[in-house]
Curated annotation (Swiss-Prot):
It comes from Clostridium acetobutylicum (strain ATCC 824 / DSM 792 / JCM 1419 / IAM 19013 / LMG 5710 / NBRC 13948 / NRRL B-527 / VKM B-1787 / 2291 / W). This is ATP synthase subunit c. Keywords: ATP synthesis, Cell membrane, CF(0), Hydrogen ion transport, Ion transport, Lipid-binding, Membrane, Transmembrane, Transmembrane helix, Transport. It holds the Pfam family ATP-synt_C. F-type ATPases have 2 components, F(1) - the catalytic core - and F(0) - the membrane proton channel. F(1) has five subunits: alpha(3), beta(3), gamma(1), delta(1), epsilon(1). F(0) has three main subunits: a(1), b(2) and c(10-14). The alpha and beta chains form an alternating ring which encloses part of the gamma chain. F(1) is attached to F(0) by a central stalk formed by the gamma and epsilon chains, while a peripheral stalk is formed by the delta and b chains. InterPro entries: ATP_synth_csu_bac/chlpt (IPR005953), ATP_synth_F0_csu (IPR000454), ATP_synth_F0_csu_DDCD_BS (IPR020537), ATP_synth_F0_csu_sf (IPR038662), ATPase_proteolipid_c-like_dom (IPR002379), F/V-ATP_Csub_sf (IPR035921).
């Protein structure tokens, strides 16, 4: 099987972008976990909502940033020559 170098590099570029996009899964799992635990905490102690919500929002932001970085890397691999 003969593959020219351009086709091989293009295939590796797509493979790398796909693997980088897998990092978005971690962000989704993290956001779901953080939100679920915050809802449980507020359900148990409704008076703690004012303390739980800011912490939850910080956790959501950190989880989302990792997904955005993974998406950025995947897009860079696809469209930058």
């Amino acid at each position: 099987m003969n593959i020219d170098s351009h086709t091989f590099l293009l295939g590796m570029q797509y493979l790398g972008a796909g693997l980088a996009a897998i990092g978005c899964i971690g962000g989704g799992v993290g956001i779901g976990t953080v939100t679920g635990k915050a809802v449980e905490a507020i359900g148990r102690q409704p008076e703690s909502a004012s303390k739980v919500m800011p912490t939850m929002i910080m956790g959501l932001a950190f989880a989302e940033v990792t997904s955005l970085y993974a998406l950025f890397v995947a897009i860079m691999l696809l469209f930058v020559k």
